[in-house]
Amino acid sequence: KRKRDAILKILRASARFYLNNLNSGHADAHIDYILSRKLSSSTVRKFGLGASLDFKSLPQYLLDQGFRREDILDSGAVVESDRHAGRLIDAQGGRLIFPIINALDDVVAFGGRVLEKMDFAKYKNTRETSVFNKSKNLYNINLLKKQKKATGLKNIIMVEGYMDTISLYQAGFTNVVASMGTALTKEQ
């Protein structure tokens, strides 16, 4: 329980950090991408989108907040560098950040999108952790659950990714969730 609570606090602090980065005046490439996808500021706020500006600042921020190194690593938001033994780096370094929030409204992971063409996948999720299993989570389940409680739902639209979900939600199709690139599982 202590470990789980610590990890959830780290992920919540990371989400706030990314959100502050997006609004810092230093996230021009991230803002340009958001504008190119025609997302409104209210949509960006509703989904808590953020920005990782580099590989170093998130780990340092979390350490400065007094979180334990072991818990920071166990959160999946930060990893050890392959190039520099013992150095902590942001697992989503440089990406546009999509917080993944569970049905209980806890930030459990992050999806990140690279902003320029690369030789690797455009999207990357936090690795599986004690609080995040990709095959058991749906992106936007938190907002869908609130909508179901408020108005009831007859249908759910299932899509593959974050941007599909956000774009449809903004267009008025608020009964949408994403499987985050995995095949639909029984748990989902």
Regions found by a protein language model. Give the residues of each.
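Phosphate-handling DNA/RNA-contact segment within nucleic-acid enzymes
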Residues: 1-7, 11-13, 55-188
